[in-house]
Amino acid sequence: QGRLEVMATLALAAPAKCAYELERAVDLFGARSALLPATAGGRPLDGPEFDGLFAVAEKLGLLLFMHPVSAESPTRFPLYGVQVLVQWPFETTLAVTRMIFEGVFDRHPGLQLLLAHGGGNLIFLKGRLNSAYEATGWEADPYYRKHVSKAPGEYYKQIFFDTCSLSPESVGFTIEVAGADRVMFGTDYPFDIGDPEAKRALPALNRLEENARIEEVHDEVLELFMDL
C-alpha cells in the first residue's frame, strides 16, 4: 500500500444526497475519510437533516475532517486576514459546540471528528461548557441538558485535535486537556501561516515520551486513514 489515501469532499447543500455520495466514494474509490465544512453555506450541521450523513460516517468508520470555509461576507473582515486568523477557528468552535448541545454525538456515539486549527477554542472552553451543563439555581438553563447525557467535555473523546494552533503552549495545553492519543500532527499546508516543518508543534511534542508519541501517531494515522 502507498502513503496516499482518498479523502472524500462533502457538498452539504443536499444532505441526503451527500450521505449517498459518501457511501459511493467509499465503494468506488476506497475513501477512508471525508472533508467536512464547518457549516453548510451558513447552515448549522446539528439539524436532523444531517443525521443520515453522520450515520453513514459512523457505520463505515470514517473520520470526518472539519475545516471551515467561511460563509461570511469578506467585507466584514477586509483587513489583516482576520477571516482566516480568527473567524475560521471561531466557526469550528461554534459548529462543534452546537453539535454537542444539540445531541449529535449522543445520536451518533461512533462518530469521530478531526478538527483543523487545534479545534479553534474548544480546548480552552471545555471548563466553561462543562460549567453550563453543571450549573444549578438561577444560572441553570435546561437547554444545556436537554439533548445530552453527560458533560460536554466528555464528547471530546470523539474528537481529534490537530497541532495547527501554532504555538508550543497551545499545542501543549491541547495534549494536556484532550490527551496525547487525541492530538494529531498537522501542518495546514499550503497556507502561509501553517506549520509545514513543525517548528511550532515539535517543542510541545518533544516534551512527551518520544518513542511513545511516535508510536501513538503512527498507529492513529494507519488506523484512521489507511485501514492498516
Task: Please report, for each region that a protein language model flagged, where it lies by residue.
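Mid-to-C-terminal alpha-helical segments outside catalytic/metal-binding sites
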Residues: Q1, Y20-R24, L111, F161, ...
